[in-house]
Amino acid sequence: MKTSGASNTDELNKSSHSKVSKKSTKSRSKSAKLELTGKNSLSASASSSIASAVSGGVAVGSLPATPTHLNMVTTPTTPTSSLGNYNLFDASFAVAGSGGHGLAGGIAGAEASGNSSRMGHQKSYAGFDPRSIKIFWEQHDQTDVELSQDVCARLAEDASYKVWELINNVKIYSRHSGGVVTYDLVNEVLKDADVPPMLGAMDSDWDRIDYDGSFYFHSDKIFELSAEFQKEVNLCTPDDADFQSICPVEDKHMDQLRQCVQSLVTAALFADSKSQTAAVCHAFQTPLMGSIYRVIVSKMVQLLAFKQQDHLSQRCWRLLRACNYNATANHNACRPEYFNLAEVLVSQLMAPYETIKAPHVDPDPGQTTSIKMEFEEELKVEPDQCHNPETQENPEVMGVEKQEQEPQMFPGESTMEHTIYKLQSEEEELNPQPEAEHLSSYFACPVGNGLVDELCETIGQLASQSGYLHAECLFLIKRRLARFFEGRHVSSERDFRYISRAVRGLIALGEYAFREFIPYIYKLRVEEIPDSLWPDLAPAAIFLGGHDDVYLYEWLEYGCGAALQPFLVHYARAYEKMVTRRYVKAKQPAYRIESVPGVRRLEWSTLAAAMCHGDDPSKALKPKPTLCEAFPDLQSPNLQLNCAGNIRFKFAGCRPVLLKPKVATVPHSEDSPSSAANGGGGGGASSDILIAKRKLFKPLTNVRKWSPISGYHYLRI
C-alpha cells in the first residue's frame, strides 16, 4: 500500500527539483519512507488528540513531548528554521507547546502568521498552521528551496480539513460500535478515507503482528469512549411547567393601570346595573387584561374570602368570568392567585375542610377498652402530646389488643366500624408525623343553594381555561368527599344536599372529575336517595360512553328515568360519527349493465347505401346474417323435453331444475321394491325428481344499502 501523501511529495520533489540527480532522489526516497511513516503516525496521533479534546473522551493515542523510543532514522535538515536540531515529532510537539505552530496552537498561530489578515474575520478552529507545513517541508527536503506562503496556507487548510474529517468519521464509527474505539476501527476509517492504516505504527510498546514491506501493523488495543455517547443529560424543568404568557408593563404606565383596576373593580361590583354591564363588557374586550389579570384575581380572592355576601359573590363571579373570557388573559402566569382562588371557590361550594365533622359512632361496650379511636380532635393535638409512656414501656399491649379484636374486622361485622376504627400495630410509630400538606390559608362560607349553579358555572369556566386550577379544584373536592364519607352513614337530607353540591361541582369540572365520584356511589343506598338529588345527577349522563358504563347507566336510569334522555348524547354522537363515516367513504354510484351477446348492425339509409356502392349492384349491402349463420354451431334447445318449465313454483326467486340421472353403482334386483316403485327404471327414474334452485341477481349499482335497524332510535349502550 502506498500513501497518497507520499506520491504527492514525490511529485512535488520531481517538479520543483528537476536538476537533482536520480541517485540522490533514490537515496532520499529510501530514508523518506520512515519519515513518512512518522508523518502518518503524527497525523493519526494528532487526529486522535483532537478527537479526545473535542469529545471529552480518552485520547486514542498521544506521544510525549520528548519521545524516547522512536524507531526511525532522523534526517538532518537545512538550517532554515530555528528548530533544525529537532526531528519531526520534537518539532511538532515543541511548537504545539509554544502555541505558535503546532496542531493545538493553530488558533493563536493563525493570528500571528502572515495569513492572519485572511483568517481574521473567520471563526477560529484548531488546525494546522502554515508555518507547521513549512516545518514539515524543511524536514522532508534537503535543498534550500522554500515553499511560498500561499502554498503552505493551502496545504495547511487541506490537511486540517482532512484531519477533521478523519476525527468525525472515527466518532461516527465508534458510535455504531457502542462507544468503543479500537485500532481496527481507526484503521478501517483510514482505509475508507484512502489513508494508510498507520495508527500506532511508531508505538514500540505494542507487539507488531504484520509487516507488508512498507508499513507495520500492530495488535489491537481498546479505548473506551462510551462516556461520550452515554452521558446523562439533565433537563431542568421549572416548577410551573404550564405554558404561560407574561405581559410586561413599563414603569411609567403603572399608575394608570392601578387606576384602571380600581375603577374597573369598583364599577363592576358597587355601581348601578348599567355601569356594571359596561364594566363587564370592558373587561371582556380590553387589550390591557393581560397586564392587570393577576391583580384583578387577587382582589377577587380577597373580596370573596372577607366579604361574605351572596350578591357581592355573584358580581365577583361575573367579573371573573368576563376577565377569563378575554383572549389576552389566556395562559397568564398566575399560579399563586389560582391556588388561593380554588380554595375560596370550593369553600363556597362545599364549606371549609375543617368544618366537615365525621360522626362519632359509639362502639360496643366490649370494644371500648381495646380499640383506639381516631377522634376528630386528634387532628389538632400537638405531636409531643401524643406520647404515651405506658405504651412505650409495654409495647406488647397493643399487639395483644390487636389479636383480640381481629375477629371484628371480618366482613360479617359492621362495615361502619371497620371504617372508623383503626388498630395500631406494634410496627407502626407511636407518634406518626402526618405529611405537611401545602394548603391555602384562605377560606369562605358556603353560599346559598340558589347560587350553586352559577358558582359551578364559574368553576367550570375557569377550570377549562387553566389546567392548574382544574387540578386544584378537583383535589380539594376529592379531599372533602373523602372526609365526608369517612365512617358516615348518609341518611339525612342535609347530607344529600352536600353530596348534590359536590356532584354538581364535579360535573362542572368535566368527565374525568365526575368519575372520581363513582366509588362513592357504592356507599349510597338507592332506596334512601331523595328525589331532589336525582335531577342533579341526570346531567352526568353526558359522560356515558359505551358498554363500559352500562352499570352507571342503569344506576342513573333507575333514579332519573325519562329525565336522563336529554343528556344521552352518546347516541347522537355515535350516530353522527356513523353518518359521517358513511359520507366520507361513499362511492360514486355506477350502474352495471351486463352485455347481451348478439349480432347487430346499424340501419343504413337508402341514400347512404347508394353513396356507398354507387350504381354497381355487386357492391350493395348484404342483408343481416341470421342467428344460425352467425353461430353455425348453435343448437336450439328442445323445449318439449324441458318438462320442468310446465311446473309452476310459488316460491319467489326459485325455478325448477331437472335433476340429472345418476348411474346406479349397485345393480338393483328386478323384484326390488324400490325399483318397482320407481317404475322399473332403476337409477333412471330419478329424472322425474325436481329441485328448486334460486337464482341470485347482482345489484345494478355498487352503492351499499344499509339496513334500517342502524338508525338513531335503534342505538343502545
Curated annotation (Swiss-Prot):
Q: What is its main location?
A: nucleus
Q: Which domain of life is it from?
A: Eukaryota
> Which biological processes are named by the entry's GO terms?
positive regulation of transcription by RNA polymerase II; RNA polymerase II preinitiation complex assembly
Q: Does the keyword Nucleus apply?
A: yes
Q: Does the record bear Acyltransferase in its keywords?
A: no
Q: What is this protein called?
A: SAGA factor-like TAF6
Question: So what does this one do?
Answer: Component of the transcription regulatory complex SAGA, a multiprotein complex that activates transcription by remodeling chromatin and mediating histone acetylation and deubiquitination. The SAGA complex predominantly acetylates histone H3. Involved in SAGA complex coactivator function but not essential for SAGA complex assembly, histone-modifying activity or chromosomal recruitment. Required for oogenesis; involved in transcriptional activation.
Q: Cross-referenced CDD domains, in alphabetical order?
A: HFD_TAF6L
Write out the entry's keywords from A to Z.
Chromosome, Nucleus, Transcription, Transcription regulation
